[in-house]
Amino acid sequence: AAASDNFMRF
């Protein structure tokens, strides 16, 4: 999921 990966990126 892109949203999940994006959150972990921060």
Swiss-Prot record:
The modification Phenylalanine amide is found at F10. GO terms for biological process: neuropeptide signaling pathway. It is found in: Secreted. Detected in the thoracic perisympathetic organs in larvae, and the dorsal ganglionic sheath in adults (at protein level). Signal peptide: none annotated. Its main location: secreted. One of its GO terms (cellular component) is extracellular region. Keywords: Amidation, Neuropeptide, Secreted. Belongs to the FARP (FMRFamide related peptide) family. This is FMRFamide-6. It comes from Lucilia cuprina.
